[in-house]
């Protein structure tokens, strides 16, 4: 970093230069009175020395202007004005304010590079102390009349607020508190999301662990059964024969049970069919009784004769005769 010359040293050097210029001017004038040779060269020399004095004076004012701009304002202006950092911080479309788009990236990378710390809240407090105001409550946008894009010369108009001013202190404290609260909210949101993600990952990991433990337990049980089977097989060579015989008996019992169920179902179907026929006969008889209240008459057409079966008591009274089968016939 280039050191800025002291104002007192510059003033003393400027005054001494002016005195030397005046002395040389008098000397030249005296020489001109003594000798009239080359007057134009003397005039040009005096003019060049006067121009050098003016240039030195302008350089002093530029250095003085730089001295009035604090390092915080100069560095902040450099950060915002750098196009490389536009995704993180940049000028607004009007270039009368600047916007911090990514507060996390700004704190982690830019602040340590220029200010050697990562405290975003401290940076906000510095802005408040220089009179910057928050433009939009939903984002980190700040504005100051002396802080505009392309107008670096206005930085000398920005002054740090006096600590003795009550009104300024109240506004600064209120703004600082609000910005700190907003900063804490901004910092809490990613932390909450991260905590939720970690909690979900923990629950998923626990669920996976339970599933793996169940699978391991199942595999252990199967291995124990297999080891027990092989142990029995090694001790008793006829174990397989008994196992096969037991299996066959089980299959036979299952077949017999299936055959029994099949026969039972068949008998049930036959019984159901018989019951249906009986019910149908009873229903037909009841229907005939309801439609013909006189005694039932049976007409037999096989022999070509018409025979009517009546009640025995009524026909015997009327002089009917009974055949071998016990039926009463009327010709």
Swiss-Prot record:
It holds the Pfam family HSF_DNA-bind. The lineage of its organism: Eukaryota, Viridiplantae, Streptophyta, Embryophyta, Tracheophyta. GO terms for molecular function: DNA-binding transcription factor activity; sequence-specific DNA binding. A motif (Bipartite nuclear localization signal) lies at residues 245-265. Homotrimer. Keywords: DNA-binding, Nucleus, Phosphoprotein, Stress response, Transcription, Transcription regulation. The keyword Nucleus applies. Residues 69-163 bind DNA. Its main location: nucleus. It is found in: Nucleus. One of its GO terms (cellular component) is nucleus. SUPFAM superfamilies: Winged helix' DNA-binding domain. InterPro entries: HSF_DNA-bd, WH-like_DNA-bd_sf, WH_DNA-bd_sf. The hydrophobic-rich region (HR-A/B) corresponds to the oligomerization domain. Residues 14-26 have a biased composition (Polar residues). This is Heat stress transcription factor A-9. Seed-specific transcriptional regulator that specifically binds DNA sequence 5'-AGAAnnTTCT-3' known as heat shock promoter elements (HSE). Seems to be specialized for the developmental expression of heat shock protein (HSP) genes during seed maturation. Activated by ABI3. Residues 175-234 are annotated as: Hydrophobic repeat HR-A/B. Belongs to the HSF family. Class A subfamily. Exhibits temperature-dependent phosphorylation. The gene is HSFA9. It comes from the Eukaryota. Residues 14-39 are annotated as: Disordered.
């Amino acid at each position: 970093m280039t050191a800025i010359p002291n104002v007192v040293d510059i003033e003393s050097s400027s005054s001494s230069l002016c005195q030397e210029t005046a002395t040389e001017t008098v000397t030249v004038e005296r020489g001109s009175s003594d000798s009239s040779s080359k007057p134009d060269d003397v005039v040009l020399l005096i003019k060049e020395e006067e121009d050098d004095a003016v240039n030195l004076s302008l350089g002093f004012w530029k250095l003085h202007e730089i001295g009035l701009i604090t390092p915080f304002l100069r560095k902040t202006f450099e950060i915002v004005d750098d196009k490389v950092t536009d995704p993180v911080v940049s000028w607004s479309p009007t270039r009368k304010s600047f916007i911090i788009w990514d507060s996390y990236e700004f704190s982690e990378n830019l602040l340590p590079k220029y200010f050697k710390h990562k405290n975003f809240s401290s940076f906000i407090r510095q802005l408040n102390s220089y009179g910057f105001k928050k433009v939009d409550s939903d984002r980190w946008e700040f504005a100051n009349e002396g802080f505009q894009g392309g107008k670096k010369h206005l930085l000398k108009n920005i002054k740090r607020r006096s600590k003795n001013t009550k009104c300024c202190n109240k506004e600064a404290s209120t703004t600082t508190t609000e910005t700190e609260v907003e900063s804490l909210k901004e910092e809490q949101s990613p932390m909450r999301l991260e905590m939720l993600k970690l909690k979900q990952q923990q629950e998923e990991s626990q669920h996976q662990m339970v599933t793996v433990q169940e699978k391991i337990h199942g595999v252990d049980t199967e291995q124990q059964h297999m080891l027990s089977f092989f142990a029995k097989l090694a001790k008793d060579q006829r174990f397989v024969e008994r196992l096969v015989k037991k299996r066959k008996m089980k299959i036979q019992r299952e077949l017999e049970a299936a055959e029994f169920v099949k026969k039972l179902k068949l008998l049930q179907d036959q019984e159901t069919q018989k019951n249906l026929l009986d019910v149908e006969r009873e229903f037909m008889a009841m229907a005939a009784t309801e439609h013909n209240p006189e005694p039932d008459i049976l007409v037999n057409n096989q022999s070509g004769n018409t025979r009517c079966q009546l009640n025995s008591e009524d026909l015997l009274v009327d002089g009917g005769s009974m055949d071998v089968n016990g039926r009463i016939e009327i010709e």
